[in-house]
């Protein structure tokens, strides 16, 4: 079995392999999207294929939406040319459930794939056509937090950004510069409203995206490269909005055991592609079942009915509360605790750590006893139930190939937010004693031990 539209016609072979297929007419979806594009997504990585693309497929399967997603890649063009187009923009989502079952689904919600390459006339002109369309409602992003950075460590604009400021929208070459250029094109073609939605896993992601795009709008309007009204357009949320969001779903690099399982079932498109930029991409993506996407409901031109696929739309304040709940109490501190001690104790799978009674006690006390008394309760999600799911279903899942080594990356930058907020809440409380905290300080001590560069058995970390 191959990921090709022509192969999907032989439904019996897919059913025999227990692989679900799209339940809608892909050709009709593509034609409708061509005429009336609604959703463009920047960033063609695993999280996109496993989450937003799957959400839209659910809406298409149920007849709630008629258009698909147009995916655009601005960092590594080879992903589009080597992984998307040769497979008719199809991918296989493998959901690894904690109860031992595996759900396999062909994702066919992508209408087309494009490179954000100004020097590729066909793709660039198609993007301009899409951005000029009044029907376009949202542009979403999974380009990592670094993707929004336009400054050097000293705070000065990077050289490529300054070059774009001088070159103007017609000649912009940086990632955000090309996005800003497309927004300017939309402005010149009638200034229809639009939502630019970062769904990257970072706090206040909408503000990060706004700051980057706004810098270009200011520079271009000040130096005469763009009309004065463009800055007003970008800074008017009734015209262009930058909603905040919180996303939570783990999509590890394609796993060898999943690859073998698919091959045994007769699925032959399993080989990973490594691009010249060292991006790993496979025709399939493996992911955990649990997923959360909370988005500020600020869409000046409408939006897909994603609430019917489980997305929660709410206020900016609530998005921030959900983010704080996850990052400061219910998920990230527990992950960091397991990552640090997992590396020290020689574990290579997070799930195996949950077989160690001492490590289970560590994260249970950090979460339930030390964290919950000062947790931020967002109202739309229960903090206790969230921790229950993390510790009873998500982390113990033996089918999730996640590692303490991956999670331990950049821990020095994470400790302050993941534990410091809880410590500050204790210090500010008249009812709680910060000296009562025992296991959160243990994580700090464990990190100091980790920095020695060797596990407890002396093996280099």
Which residues are covered by each model-predicted region?
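Substrate/ligand-engaging "lid" and interaction regions
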Residues: 1-42, 46-461
């Amino acid at each position: 079995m191959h990921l090709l539209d022509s192969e999907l016609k032989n439904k019996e072979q897919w059913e025999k392999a227990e692989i679900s297929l799209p339940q809608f007419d892909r050709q009709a979806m593509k034609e409708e999207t061509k005429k009336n594009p609604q959703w463009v997504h920047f960033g063609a990585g695993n999280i996109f294929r496993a989450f937003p693309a799957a959400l839209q497929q659910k809406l298409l399967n149920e007849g709630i939406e008629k258009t698909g997603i147009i995916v655009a890649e601005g960092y590594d063009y080879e992903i589009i040319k080597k992984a998307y187009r040769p497979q008719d923009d199809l991918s296989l989502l493998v959901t690894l459930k904690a109860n031992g079952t595996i759900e396999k689904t062909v994702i066919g919600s992508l209408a087309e794939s494009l490179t954000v390459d100004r020097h590729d006339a066909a793709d660039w002109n198609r993007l301009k056509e899409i951005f000029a369309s009044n029907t376009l409602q949202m542009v979403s992003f999974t380009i990592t937090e670094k993707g929004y950075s336009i400054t050097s460590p000293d705070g000065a604009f990077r050289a490529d950004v300054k070059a774009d400021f001088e070159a103007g929208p017609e000649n912009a070459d940086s990632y955000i510069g090309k996005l800003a250029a497309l927004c300017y094109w939309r402005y010149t073609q009638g200034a229809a409203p639009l939502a630019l939605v970062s769904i990257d896993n970072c706090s206040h992601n909408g503000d990060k995206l706004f700051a980057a795009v706004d810098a270009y709008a200011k520079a271009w309007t000040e130096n005469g490269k763009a009309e004065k009204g463009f800055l007003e357009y970008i800074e008017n949320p009734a015209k262009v909005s930058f909603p905040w969001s919180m996303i939570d779903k783990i999509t590890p690099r394609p796993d060898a055991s999943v690859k073998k399982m698919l091959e045994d079932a007769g699925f032959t498109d399993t080989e990973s592609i490594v691009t010249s930029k060292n991006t790993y991409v496979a025709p399939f993506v493996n992911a955990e079942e649990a997923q959360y996407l909370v988005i500020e409901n600020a869409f000046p031109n409408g939006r897909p009915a994603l609430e019917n696929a489980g997305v929660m739309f709410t206020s900016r304040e609530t998005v921030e509360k959900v983010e704080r709940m996850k990052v400061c109490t219910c998920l990230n501190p527990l992950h960091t605790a397991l990552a640090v001690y997992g590396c020290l104790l020689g574990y290579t799978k997070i799930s195996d750590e949950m077989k160690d009674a001492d490590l289970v006690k560590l994260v249970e006390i950090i979460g339930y006893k030390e964290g919950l008394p000062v947790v931020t309760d967002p109202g739309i999600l229960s903090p206790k139930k969230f921790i229950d799911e993390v510790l009873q279903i998500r982390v113990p899942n033996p089918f999730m190939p996640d590692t303490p080594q991956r999670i331990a990356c950049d821990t020095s930058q994470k400790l302050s937010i993941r534990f410091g907020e809880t410590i500050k809440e204790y210090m500010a409380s008249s009812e709680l004693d910060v000296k009562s905290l025992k296991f959160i300080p243990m994580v700090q001590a464990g990190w100091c031990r980790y920095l020695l560069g060797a596990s407890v058995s002396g093996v280099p970390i």
